[in-house]
Regions:
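Active-site neighborhoods and metal-handling regions in enzymes and metal-associated proteins
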Residues: 1-258
C-alpha cells in the first residue's frame, strides 16, 4: 500500500482549509437550537465556507446533494440535510464539514446537543469524544496503525458501547479520500502498516449505544443503526510532523467538545 506523505512546508493550504472547517464548526454552537432545520444548517455552512474562501468537498461528490453531512440521533454518518426535519429538544446531531482550499482538504465533525439531552445520550457523546482524543495519543512514526482501533475498542467496550465497522477514517490531502484506511476497530492485518512522518489522515470513530450493525437508507447515503439506537461521532484531521501530531482541525476557540 502506497501512503502519500507531505512536507510541512507544502501543506499550508491544508492547514487553512482545516482552520476554516474548525471555525465554522465553532460557529454552529450559536446556530444549532430547537426549531432549526438541517437544511438551514447546510446553507449556513455553505455560505460561510464560500465567504472564507473555500469550497465544500461533499457537494456533488459521487452524487451527494448537499455541502455538509448532518447525522441525527440514530444516523451514523452521511445524513443528508433536509427542509423537513426541525431539530427537537433532546436530539443529538453530528455535523461533518470538509473545506477545500487550493485542492487541499480539511475534514472534521462534531456532536451538537439540542437542549437537554438524556443521560445515555450525554454519556455516548462523552465516550465517543474520549475515543477520538485518546486514540490520537497512540500516533507516532513507526507505530502500527492498528493501535488506533485497539484504543477505540478498549474505551467503547469498557463503557458497553459498540464500534461501527462499516465506515472508517482515511488519508486526506489533495484528495478527499486517500490511503490508508484508518480502522476504528482492531484488525491484525493492519499491525504491519505503520505511521510515517508526513501523513495526513482523519480519525473519526462512530460509536453506537447498541449493536455495531448499520444499514443504508433508500437515499443511498444515510447510514443508520440497525437496532435504532443512538450513534455519535467526532472527527479530526491530523498531520504527523516529525515526532509530533498536529491536529489541523483543532477548535480555534477551544470548543471542540462541550
Amino acid at each position: 500500500m502506497k501512503i502519500k506523505t507531505y512536507k510541512s512546508s507544502e501543506i499550508n493550504s491544508c492547514r487553512e482549509a482545516s482552520k476554516i472547517t474548525a471555525t465554522i464548526l465553532d460557529e454552529l454552537n450559536n446556530l444549532i437550537s430547537v426549531g432549526i432545520t438541517t437544511d438551514e444548517i447546510d446553507k449556513f455552512c455553505l455560505d460561510r465556507i464560500k465567504k472564507l474562501g473555500g469550497s465544500p468537498a461533499p457537494l456533488f461528490y459521487r452524487g451527494f446533494p448537499k455541502s455538509i453531512c448532518t447525522s441525527l440521533n440514530r444516523v451514523i454518518c452521511h445524513g443528508i440535510p433536509s427542509k423537513d426535519r426541525k431539530l427537537e429538544e433532546g436530539d443529538i446531531l453530528n455535523v461533518d464539514v470538509t473545506t477545500v482550499i487550493d485542492g487541499w482538504h480539511g475534514d472534521s465533525s462534531r456532536m451538537y446537543k439540542v437542549g437537554n439531552i438524556s443521560v445515555k445520550a450525554q454519556n455516548l457523546c462523552n465516550i465517543t469524544h474520549a475515543c477520538l482524543i485518546e486514540s490520537l495519543n497512540v500516533i507516532k512514526p513507526g507505530s502500527s496503525i492498528s493501535l488506533i482501533g485497539k484504543k477505540i475498542e478498549e474505551i467503547a467496550y469498557l463503557n458497553n458501547f459498540s464500534v461501527v465497522k462499516d465506515f472508517c477514517g482515511h488519508g486526506v490531502g489533495l484528495k478527499f479520500h486517500e490511503n490508508p484506511s484508518i480502522l476504528h476497530y482492531y484488525d491484525k492485518d493492519y499491525d504491519n502498516i505503520k505511521f510515517v512522518d508526513g501523513m495526513i489522515f482523519t480519525v473519526e470513530p462512530m460509536i453506537n449505544a447498541g449493536k455495531y450493525h448499520s444499514k443504508i437508507l433508500n437515499d443511498g447515503w444515510t447510514a443508520v443503526t440497525k437496532d435504532k439506537t443512538l450513534s455519535a461521532q467526532y472527527e479530526h484531521t491530523v498531520y504527523i510532523n516529525g515526532d509530533s501530531v498536529e491536529i489541523l482541525t483543532e477548535s480555534p476557540n477551544g470548543v471542540f467538545y462541550s
